[in-house]
């Protein structure tokens, strides 16, 4: 019977199985984009974005050791009628 991979395991490559293709890419970098028709700029102050970065860092470090606050980048921009919140997390290299 095959063992089912969990979401975080498949994303960060923490299972014993060898990583291939997109799993290796996910190990290197996690990118999340959130789009909203409601204006985010009214709710996202610089302080709130910094708090969000710290909370995200705390969660990511439960699964991947060595991620620093400088590895988390959050950008806000408008695209057509949408507000886009883009987050990039540079992950340390996966050691085999």
Curated annotation (Swiss-Prot):
Q: What name appears for this protein in its UniProt entry?
A: Cell division topological specificity factor
The record's section on NCBIfam families has:
minE, PRK00296.1
Signal peptide positions are: none
Give a short account of what the protein does: Prevents the cell division inhibition by proteins MinC and MinD at internal division sites while permitting inhibition at polar sites. This ensures cell division at the proper site by restricting the formation of a division septum at the midpoint of the long axis of the cell.
Q: Which gene encodes it?
A: minE
What would be one Pfam family of this protein?
MinE
Keywords, in A-Z order: Cell cycle, Cell division
* Source organism per UniProt: Psychrobacter arcticus (strain DSM 17307 / VKM B-2377 / 273-4)
- Family listed: Belongs to the MinE family.
GO BP, one example? regulation of division septum assembly
């Amino acid at each position: 019977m095959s063992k089912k991979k969990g979401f975080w395991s498949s994303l960060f490559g923490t299972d014993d199985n060898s990583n291939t293709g997109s799993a290796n890419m996910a190990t290197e970098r996690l990118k999340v984009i959130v789009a909203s028709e409601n204006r985010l700029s009214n709710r996202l102050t610089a302080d709130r974005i910094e708090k969000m970065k710290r909370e995200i860092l705390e969660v990511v470090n439960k699964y991947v050791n060595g991620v620093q606050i400088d590895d988390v980048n959050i950008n806000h921009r408008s695209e057509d009628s949408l507000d886009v919140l883009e987050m990039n997390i540079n992950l340390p290299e996966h050691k085999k």
